[in-house]
Amino acid sequence: MRHMPVYGVSDYPNQLANEPRVSLRPLGASRRLLTRSYSAKSASPKRSTSSGALPLPKLNYEDLIQADQASNAKNRNVNLPERTFVALRRDLDAWKTTTRGVDELRARQSHVGEAVRAAATPEDKEKAVRKARVLRDSVHTHEREISRLEKSLLTYGLRIPNTSHPDVPLGPESNARIVSTHGPAPIPADPKRDHNKLNDLAEMKFFDRDVGVISSGAGFAYLRGGGALLEVALIAYAMEIAVRKGFEPVITPDVVRRDIADRCGFVPRDEEVKGDEDTEIKTPEQMYAVQSKHESAEGSLVLAGTSEIPLAAMHAQALYNPQTLPRRTVAVGHAFRAEAGARGKDTRGLYRVHQFTKVELFSVTTGEATKRTDNQTTQQTNIDKPSDRELEYLRELQIELYAGLGIPFRVLDMPSEELGASAHRKYDIEAWMPGRGAWGEISSASNCTDYQARRLHIRHRHPHDDTSSAGPLPYAHTLNGTAVAVPRLIIALIENGVRFKEGGDLECLVLPTVLRKHWVGGDKFGEIEIRWE
């Protein structure tokens, strides 16, 4: 059984040494903390233009120590050290006590300072000065302890995955619930429809992994001829639909800071490398590192595993008016996946490659409503959140897109062990691939609630009619979905679309009419005739 890796643990505590200490106030008690990153009068976020480094993530430790967090992590098959929640509760209690203590010491410092100024004799002044020195040393001791506790809290807190939607099925991938099926009835499995075998035909060759090995190494492929044209058409088709529905088109960088990827909770799944309880949990290296002589200035860089990462970074440190949400973007980018643990037949063709083109959907919505109780801010238990509705919107958009391609596909509500670190709920879409004789994932859509927003500092103002507007500014919710993952859609289209003559020779390739206006290769796929239906 695969274990879900734990994300983004190691980098942040080291940043604490250079980060000015700010109050954690687990329930966001102080609005003055917002002045470090946000303007109270402008919707435009304040961003660092020098180094681009973000403040440390703001986690809600009161939520993280709740009893259901441990069972949620277990349900998601996240391998946390047993001491995680005990240590969190211990350190949070100690942080509260130490913070109260330092506040009391500072109040006493103020009184002693007045005593120094009001001293009538040199002896009285010297006595007051000695008290001031003792208090100063005690304050410094408390501050060092607070800094240590904050580092410990963040280290443990970052290991804990997002909450899970109440309707998420429990268990492994096999427990996924089929939500709906679409398109024509699946045709029988047929080995001669295997896209690898079809690619071996000279008249149809549409990809080449052999030259990919020469240029880049195993696991890279060239799309050629009809394969390249099909990628262009699929991208244009997906962008047309998304832009028509109001998504802002974006071309993102393919290189991102490792810190940003960590904050998004992104590492493609693979077999976890586990340490013992007294060591940091480790995960396999699934992202390609970028070596640069400017690394000291730019920080550690990686190739993006998905455009979701740079799209999320677009909103870092943003403060939005709720009336402007949801904000929707669609990006064309490349996804880079090292997939160190991948083995077997899927490494032969296009199903699993190290680099591919992807059209990604991304949304930012308002967060959950908050209420004030006993000077604390808690989230209302509302499963009909704006982000829940946005997830359904993304799912419906994906269904419309794939229905236009005329392939058999189904939507799955993915179980807890398939959610990764960041997803609150996730739908996968699988297409029938008769040459593989199996359903294959072509898309997903995830609601990450405030998991990424807390790490990237994405907030919004209170609605005007919100009675809790005196509380801290809420965190936004982020969502992402795949419009097109090119290689697997090519597999689905070709394996479902080829037509054979009675003798078994290729007759034609049926492609959906919606792609015709984006096709620049006439009515041929290589040397094979295209029939548009």
Q: Could you describe each region identified by the protein language model?
A:
Residues R2-P186:
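N-terminal alpha-helical targeting/anchoring segments
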